[in-house]
Amino acid sequence: MDNKGWSLKGSLLFLLLLLSDLLLCKSVASLPICPSGAVNCQVSLRDLFDRAVILSHYIHNLSSEMFNEFDKRYAQGRGFITKAINSCHTSSLPTPEDKEQAQQIHHEDLLNVILRVLRSWNDPLYHLVTEVRGLHEAPDAILSRAIEIEEQNRRLLEGMEKIVHQVHPGVRENEVYSVWSGLPSLQMADEDSRLFAFYNLLHCLRRDSHKIDSYLKLLKCRIVYDSNC
């Protein structure tokens, strides 16, 4: 997808989310989630899940596009894919590998899995934006996606924290996450080593964003619709 098409898609998503925010956060008597006279708007669990699913799917699409763009421009003929298997910094976190495994996990545990993975990406996404600028002839398509993903990952994390507070009010969160130590690899002088570090990070981001997207859709079905979907 070219930059113009991506920009149009991003703009449409932001308009959708903005409209959702306006509709949900005005104290209008016709909206049951905001009773008449309420000082603070309380967004329903269903609406929180709707937003989270939209965001997670958007992030996964951007991650896939960014990985494909990087692979096409920098990784052809270098054999990176064979070295990238099972070398993600989040591999230390126990996560279900497929839908069948995820269905066996209690929703509270699955919510915590999502929080841990999202928190584990805060630091690498911040540095990814900075280091991508130093790539030789780095295309705007990669940089713009990196910036967008970092911002939307923060929004999704905030949304997930609100969901957890509604599903389990009063429960104190355990802020567990996997520490990323890959910054020196993104700054290596050897070009092949540096490009592989970028490739591996983007490969892992695509993998984890797909997992989160799948887990969220499963949780929405289970919690909001009582598995009747």
Swiss-Prot record:
UniProt organism field: Felis catus
Residues linked to a glycan: N61
Subunit organization: Interacts with PRLR.
Phosphoserine found at: S56, S64, S120
Record-linked Gene3D superfamilies: 1.20.1250.10
Similarity-based family: Belongs to the somatotropin/prolactin family.
Tree of life domain: Eukaryota
Record-given protein name: Prolactin
Subcellular compartments: Secreted
InterPro entries, per database record: 4_helix_cytokine-like_core (IPR009079), Somatotropin/Prolactin (IPR001400), Somatotropin_CS (IPR018116)
